[in-house]
Design a protein with these regions (language model features):
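Surface-exposed loop/turn elements that mediate protein-protein interactions on large endomembrane-trafficking
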Residues: 32-47, 77-92, 119-136, 160-182, ...
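Hydrophilic extracytoplasmic domains
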Residues: 23-25, 190-233
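Short glycine/acidic-enriched loop and turn motifs that connect beta-strands
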Residues: 71-75, 115-119, 156-158, 210-214
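Sec/Tat signal peptide C-region and signal peptidase I cleavage site
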Residues: 16-20
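Blade-terminus and WD-like Trp-Asp/Gly-His loop motifs, strongest in beta-propeller folds
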Residues: 56-64, 101-109, 142-149, 189, ...
């Protein structure tokens, strides 16, 4: 078994909005015929009249562009992925729900959106056809891009789940009740209030709750647990 020392430059996830790329790419044209152009005035998109361009995102290497748009009179939005070198469409799909952000990794495009239930959904989509390969859901996700870690502190299920940010695969799940019992705190219900990064893949979790001890169920507690993630092959 070898320890995996992830290289920041290859696994970093970067989210770029249209504002970060407004110098190189822009939405322009007549009111009824908006298109996206690059800095050399090359037209990238070829939408029909009255197409609504809600947003677009450029990959860190400037080789791909994802456009979130809706054709005139259509009920649903579309996501279209372009190859900026060939100016051709790679893939297109109807994502079904809103697109609040897009993140780019080596192997996956991550569509991020807020669900109707209040949580955040990370959809890991293939660059080839935009199909969903993997999904991570969390009410209060903690994103450590530099460490390639995505954390789901799930108070309801009394657990903390760690994922690789770059591909959404699960690394480790911590049972909070067992972790607290190791500190001689026998908890009934818990609430994870805050997560802080305190080192390289090392995190501090601020937890409060009630005891699960006969006659002491009304007693409250506050504590902190620290967890360090060591990735192994």
């Amino acid at each position: 078994m070898k320890k995996v020392f992830l290289i920041f430059s290859t696994l970093i996830v970067i989210s770029l909005s249209v504002f970060a790329q407004e110098i190189k790419f822009r939405i322009d044209g007549k009111p009824y015929n908006k298109q996206i152009y690059d800095e050399n005035n090359n037209q990238i998109t070829n939408f029909k009249n009255w197409e609504l361009i809600q947003d677009f995102y450029i990959s860190p290497d400037n080789k791909k562009m994802l456009v979130y748009h809706r054709p005139d009179k259509a009920k649903a939005f579309l996501m279209t992925l372009y190859n900026l070198e060939t100016k051709k469409i790679i893939a297109e799909c109807e994502p079904g729900w809103a697109c609040n952000d897009v993140k780019w990794t080596k192997n996956y495009l991550i569509k991020v959106w807020g669900t109707s239930g209040g949580g955040i959904r990370f959809e890991y989509r293939s660059y080839e056809d935009l199909s969903i390969v993997r999904v991570v859901n969390s009410y209060y996700p903690f994103e450590d891009v530099e460490g390639n870690i995505l954390i789901d502190p799930d108070s309801m299920m009394k657990k903390i789940v760690f994922y690789h940010y770059s591909d959404g695969t699960e690394i480790k799940t911590i049972d909070c009740i067992k972790e607290l019992a190791n500190k001689k705190i026998y908890a009934g219900w818990i609430q994870i209030n805050e997560v802080k990064k305190i080192g390289k893949r090392k995190y501090k979790f601020y937890i409060e709750g009630n005891l699960n001890i006969e006659g002491r169920q009304e007693e409250e507690f506050k504590t902190v647990i620290e967890i360090e993630i060591k990735c192994e092959l």
